[in-house]
Amino acid sequence: MIWLSKTFSDRLERPWTKVDDAFAVEGEEYRNPEGANRRTLRFEVDGKGYFLKLHWGVGWKEILKNLLSLRLPVIGAANEWRAIQRLGELGVETMRLAAYGKEGWNPATQRSFVVTRELENSISLEDYCADWAGRPPAFAEKQRLIARVAAMTRRLHRNGINHRDLYICHFLLRQPWDGAEETLHLHLIDLHRVQLRRRVPRRWRVKDVGSLYFSAMETGLTRRDLWRFLRVYHDQPLRSIFEQQGEFLRAVEKRAMALKEKGIPDE
């Protein structure tokens, strides 16, 4: 199965007709996690930048090991392809699909790929906020970013989606930005481990929000900033949140502290 967007197909010297065409692409390697059976490349077509994620069979041994550890194995590009489409339906800014393909039905041996347009003139929130502790941004600018991240997270969780790697480095802010709400464009990336279902279990909401909290700890956020996030995420007054969500808040704190001790795993 091969799908190409018309724009991407028109830019190719010859259209891709099989998975081998994607695996033959040469480009700048961005990621190649050891033992993960996937790699990410950046390449250009007609002067436009694209990212290509290649997946190949992880083998039944690896699949069973993950399942026995109560972890869902990433066995192909289909998950990211579906996640990008779903986020688009929900109005959550993310990557733009250019191509997708899959070869074979056996999850232990199949090969697949997904191509997305490069998000040009963007910076990760991790880099954008790196000096906030020493050089705080304008109050309104910070509040808008916090509210946007909280609203995006709320929309995911209320629609049966959890990210599993929800760190501020996976939010890309379009540049330049003048601090206004109407010009704020924040894209969520790295969706290959996203889970899609009817309802997100509490433990996965805790993991997402705890991961966000951990990754923002060094940005100089104040107690009021955290309260702002909670108000938008829960869509409730603070009094109600503290009365009804105490267990959730303690679990989020525990998750964040655990990550602080051991660091972010390279999944």
Model-derived features with residue positions:
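Hydrophobic residue at the +6 position relative to the catalytic HRD Asp in the kinase catalytic loop
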Residues: L166, H170-D178
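Conserved ATP-binding subdomain of kinase catalytic cores across diverse folds
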Residues: P15-E126, P136-P137, R154, R158-N159, ...
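Activation segment of protein kinase catalytic domains, centered on the conserved DFG
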Residues: W132-R144
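Short, solvent-exposed loop/turn segments that connect beta-strands within catalytic domains
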Residues: W105-Q110, P176-H185
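C-terminal structural cap/anchor segments
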Residues: K142-A147, T153, R164, C169
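C-lobe/activation-segment region of protein kinase-like
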Residues: L184-M257
